[in-house]
Amino acid sequence: MKRVFTAAFLLSVCLGFINLTGQEAKPAITTEDYTKWQNLGSAAISDNGKWISWGIRYVDGDDSLYIKNTDTGKVFGYAFSSTVSFSSDSKWASMRIGYSEKETEKMTEQKKPVRFKTRLLNLADGTEKIFENVESFYFTRDASHLIMSGYVGDKRTRDLFLCHLSSGRVKNLGNISESAVNKAGNRLAYIISAEDKKGNGVELLNLADYSVTFLDNDTALYRSLVWEREGNALAFMKEYKDTAYTEANYKLFTVRNISTKPDIRAFSPAGSQAIPEKMRISEAYRPVWSKDMKTLFFGVYTWTPKPVKAKSGTSAADAKLPGLDIWHWKDDPIQPRQKITYNTDNNFTYLFAWNIDQNSVIRLTDEELTRGMITGDGKHVIAMNESLYRPAFREELYDFYIVNTLTGEKKLLLEKFPMISGTSPEGRYAIYFKEKNWWLYDIYKGQHINMTAQVPTIFWNTRDDSPKEVKPPFGTSGWLKDDKGFLANDEYDVWRIPTDGTKAVRLTAGKETGTIYRITRLDFEDNFIDPLKDMYFSAFGDIDKKSGYYRIPVKGKASMLVYDDKSITNLAKAKNTDQFIFRSETYSESPNLFLTGYAFTSPVKVTETNRQQAEYAWGRSELVHYKNVHGQDLQGALFYPSNYEPGKKYPMIVYIYEIRSNMLHRYTTPSVRSSYNTTNFTSQGYFVYQPDIVYRENNPGLSAVECVVPSVEAVIKTGMIDEKKIGLMGHSWGAYQTAFIITQTELFSAAVAGAPLINMISMYNEIYWNSGSPNQNIFETSQGRLREPWWDIMEEYMANSPMFQARNINTPLLVAFGTNDGAVDWHQGIEMFTTMRRLEKPYIMLVYDGENHSLAKKENQLDYTKKVNEFFNHHLLGTEPQEWITSGKKYIEKRREEDKVKK
């Protein structure tokens, strides 16, 4: 079998034999050093491009925030701070002030509320104000105010603090249950909910002079303030009650002509023929404005009559209900799913439209057409029938209808179809993927149009190897302004598909170079892409793993702005200037921010994270090319041990999931709470290898063997690996493959599997408890890649199940589960435990009480990371085994340890 390495890979191996004599080797990092390391958090750039902010999170969990002036280099730094925002005039910054991780843990243990502060920073002189007990905050669009919301008190209201930025004055509004600022930032709407209810109402505050317009007041409660998108109209709801019913009903209010003389309209369901009897306007659906402000959409649902009091003489025992769930084979969805969706189902609403000027109400969804998607202009709704093709054991299918919001007229759009991808911003088109092409439905003309039949490329996702009936597309990247077209992706490129029937245009040229281009949105204010503005694209080398950004300017030649053997991501632009920031990293270069101008000629490093790394030995990463047993070209990311010495053989740990070679340039911060951490292992003298896996239908486990084994053998041939000291590990799907691979080969000397699937038949019949849905769909249409139910292809299920091949295992296996795992039930681990125990084969299972699919508790993260290291170090490095490895731990010993801690 032929293994293929690139020339660059082989050359790097050869160059590794050049000894740099005279240089003292740097020490490898130890677990005591881990707390020195930082993670670069989210970043932002002010609208004028003069200020950049970024977060730093240390390994111990504490946050810091930095703000830097791009002209002077001046830096503000703050501990335990996060969530920064800049005012639109770039004169101010605000941020959340929190606590250290230890303080937060202490308050949580003492059941004290964790309440944050807000810092307001004057960027010109560095002066600041601190505001206590602030839950959320934001600058108004016109940069006149910082608006802060306090925490909800016992009366379900909060204080609202309005800080006038130029004067520093703070206005306090009390008893506020809800507030919202319009887009321009000059008007604040708020709801007052006073304790005695006499002062309840909705008011509109002019932020320029603090004059107040009273929109409505009553002893009733109000809710659901909703501004129209441009801030020119407001809607809200007013509660009223009927003693015959359990829930409140609501009146709708709209306020238009906000800037002149407010035009206030109201609709009451009381006595209205438009609202069916025993139904009410529901608070669960926040009203939605149409684009022209002529229609308000709202939700309606059943109004529950108050229960009739029990007749006298009825005993309490008779009134008690059994603690019973009835699982019925006709249930759709099944009981666990119904429990998960209870709140959603309980707040379900039917969609109605209030046409304000005509004061008419139209019902848009009902018991048959249950859900609706409002089009961009609000003149139509795409409604779906969810019940016709259920239960859906594979892909879910629906009938879709177009409903006119003025007349209620319904027209069939698509029958027995999986999904509508969306509608255009102006509301003319619905877009969907059918027969491997993108289609539009012209709502105005009532026509279906195949938009890509003549485009010389493939839009369906050829990389999707799941057993779906219909392959999904590579996706779209957005609509053009005025519905003049949309952007569609193929495997490598982005195409502009005009809606006027003219020829499609390929915007990028990635196919020829193996570069994957995708649109990068730098301005999210509009819900469309303006072709009269520069267009930016991310670029990723499918083969060489380079990355960067590409620009198509309005005028001039398209060009690659930055493209390197690094992971270059998170491009952002200052709103009002041509200043850009991006993030750059490799496995050996800590992530940093870079600032650049329009030409991208000389990016300047803004941050310097993890400077201490220079004091320690650090590994490097290289790309491996190989072929699986079927001759498919695949790749893997190989990470060298720190202080690698040419000519010496090293142990290696292989980490698997699906496609992993794209992690080649991902920097990995060491951590005592990260069990599968690449740097943790390279600093201990291991190679770490992450190969790609592709799949054959109905053979997920065997496919993994066919990719992983030849890949590892190819790396062994370099002479750098001690073939008797190779470990294998993975989590979830990677853990399944880990457990299965060791049934087919003795290539590995130890294996670690976190939450593995063990028995594909019993797993097929299990529930995915996190969602409450059966696992069958995952197997037949998704990651499981077993197209049929187990009773139709039982041999394949058994042949790809670790449990049914367990007698072949000779590799020591460490498995971990949480008892509340809602993805892979921990009884999968028990099945393997009892099987391996009966076979008298080495198997250790760590069971973490109360944990879900991934460990969340700090103490458990620390423990699992430690045990994974100890397990591999014993089996691969030959260290003395801990007692838990040789003989486990008795339950009575565990209880005695817990009792000591409690004392």
Model-flagged regions — what are they?
Residues E386, F540, E585, Y655-I659, ...:
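Glycine-rich His-Gly loop
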Residues S12, G22-Q579, E585-P591, L595-T596, ...:
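Beta-propeller folds
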Residues G153, E195, K241-T243, N643, ...:
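Short strand->helix junction
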Residues Q454-P467, F600, E608-K725, M729-S732, ...:
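Cap/lid segment of the alpha/beta-hydrolase catalytic domain
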Residues A284, M293, G378, E435, ...:
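Active-site lining segments that contact anionic ligands and/or coordinate catalytic metals
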Residues M1-A25:
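Bacterial Sec-dependent N-terminal signal peptides
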